[in-house]
Amino acid sequence: MNTQDFCFILKQNSHLLREGCFGLEKENVRVNQDGTLALTPHPAVFGDKGKHPYITTDFSESQVEMITPPLPSVGEALGFMETLHDVVTENIGDELLWPQSLPPVLKENQEIPIAHYSGEFKDKEYYRQKLAGTYGKERQLISGIHFNFSFSEKLMDVLLKSGVCGSSMEEVRETVYFRVVRNFLKYRWLFIWLYGESPLAEETLNVISLKTGEKQPMKCGVSLSLRTSPLGYRNREEFFIDYSSLEAYNMSIDKLIRENRIDGPHELYLPVRIKFLEKDNGSPSYIEVRIVDLDPFTKSGVCASAIYFSHLLLVYSLLKEENGSLTEEELQRATRNQDMASCYGRDEKKELKCCSTTVQQKATSILEDMERILSEYGVLDDEIYRQEMQHNLYLVQNPEKRIGMVLYENINRVGFVPFHLENERQYSET
């Protein structure tokens, strides 16, 4: 691909860069008034969990999953999710939706019910039983948000007509989405450093070590996001996935399946995933960002600034120059930087694995580059996006104002369970 021509076409059609389809998926554990896990079945009022388009279960019968349809703006996706959250809250009686990604109070030898499925969906239950054996039920209760995004079909059509990405729509989608994922994987540590919101776990929580298989406390360093840390929702092994092309990507996943290291692509717990729909003939359809923690300070549990920044980072990842591949060494370095942000994110003087510079210095450099490039392409002409960019620049200069730092101080002051329960009780009354 001629990068210069590619960038020229994007600049000529910069009004399309902010457009696309936006969706959210969110999990919350249902709890009793004392913060213990609710053991009641998934509310019958929502019907068959295997067929409901918006409200279902995740791993556990006690874990509600809410899913928006694809919508034309971030604001509409946020609004739809808040409506779903309200509907669920109104139909769970005296129970509450636990507002934290990390699990609530789990008693010793706590029963954690696996989501029950029947008939044509029975395989979903068998799959969950396998996960429980491999990763432990406690880890499977870790909840969060997935942000789904696809670029505008108009933008795809423009790129197809220009010929800069190939002669078919499949080639265009491959070029665009793999370029974005390669860059996003390198910069994902920055998102976690700015918006991680699982700094502390309930003090009695133990999870199975992915290395030893033994139970261990869920603690690491001066953590900011335990959910995205090595103790959180990860595969037992660190896999090398080849993102240089669709063919190489498929070959690397097929190899893992042949070696019985995973059952299929759905078992890759990656920070960002390329998703495929049949309508797109096997080419990439959208990107799923999987590193967003629940926000205990927001009724719906979704921090709007985190989603807007995620969108800006995806667009930046399309525009940012890169060499078309990620080596295994580069992927490992990106993972170590994620681990640093998640386990040591409260220490802004920590150095990155890429260079002899502090996290705060590198974050400033990237955000300033983002502002320059996104302004050049007109992405920040929109007032909301311009304000969000300024907000992130403010956070990097005032790291104590990051939402995860504020959350950490509140948990330390009030206590893990009391703080989250009080917040959720207030939300459920509004």
Where are these regions (language model features)?
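Terminal catalytic/cofactor-binding subdomain
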Residues: 1-132, 139-143, 309-312
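Histidine-centered divalent-metal-coordination microenvironment in nucleic-acid enzymes
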Residues: 27, 139-152, 286-293
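Short, flexible loop/turn elements at secondary-structure junctions
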Residues: 30-32, 68-70, 101-103, 149-155, ...
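Short conserved micro-motifs at the rims of enzyme active sites and ligand-binding pockets
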Residues: 39-42, 78, 111, 159-160, ...
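Long, well-ordered alpha-helical scaffolding segments within enzyme catalytic domains
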Residues: 79-92, 160-196, 301-326
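Loop-rich catalytic cores of soluble enzymes, especially ATP-dependent carboxylate-amine ligases
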Residues: 106, 117-137, 141, 150-284, ...
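Long, well-ordered mid-to-C-terminal structural blocks that present hydrophobic/aromatic surfaces
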Residues: 254-354
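Cationic, histidine-enriched alpha-helical/coil surfaces that engage anionic ligands
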Residues: 323-328, 334-430
